[in-house]
Amino acid sequence: DYTCPQNYAAYTSADHETYSRLYKRQSALLPGLACDEFIAALPSLGLSERIPRFEDINSTLFKATGWEVVAVPGLIPEVPFFTLLANRKFPVTDWIRKPEEFDYIVEPALSNVPVWLLELVLSPGFPDHLQAYGAGGLKAHRLGACEQLSRLYWYTIEFGLMRQRGGIRAYGAGILSSAGELTYGVKSAEPQRTMLVVLR
């Protein structure tokens, strides 16, 4: 299933510093840019500026949602990914971004673990939605429809925006973990923001 242990002892002081810098910067940027549910969930897991231990996070996360984070070595194939989601396990690479990747990275690295964890506790329906998405992904794979499901995932869970009373707000993990994407996606007049119509 591609999961592996989190080798916490392997993290260097530079890794902890990178994580701390990212955590502090993103925490300061979130008010007014992140959705209300995300802001409300911030204190729920007691995350800090230190690299989190998965077992510590999971003890809280599992009680709240029935989910847990599992370490994987990198991007994994569709079937193992969807299987993990269907079993309420979210795969996260256990490595820290390099300084040159500080503002954006393609893979769900440990650097945006807080984002994913908070996504899972945003609302009572989200944990079940993500599990159903995993089950749906397995069905889509059998039907040869993974491309469509991947697109939906990309524009919602990864880069989703929503309209709230205060205006456009971010809820996608890829946006919330990147300073540039967060400000651009929510505040800039340049992006073309299209209302999601699932059947389109």
Residue ranges and their predicted role:
Residues 1-121:
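The feature captures two recurrent sequence modes
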Residues 126-146:
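A long, hydrophobic alpha-helical segment
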Residues 117, 121-124, 196-200:
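Short, intrinsically disordered, charge-balanced linker/junction segments flanking boundaries
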Residues 173-200:
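C-terminal structured domains
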Residues 59-63, 116, 131-135, 151-161:
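Short, hydrophobic/amphipathic alpha-helical patches that form generic packing surfaces
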Residues 64-72, 124, 136-140, 159-163:
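Short secondary-structure junctions and interdomain/linker hinges
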Residues 140-173, 177-180:
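Extended, Lys/Arg-enriched charged tracts that mediate electrostatic binding to polyanionic substrates
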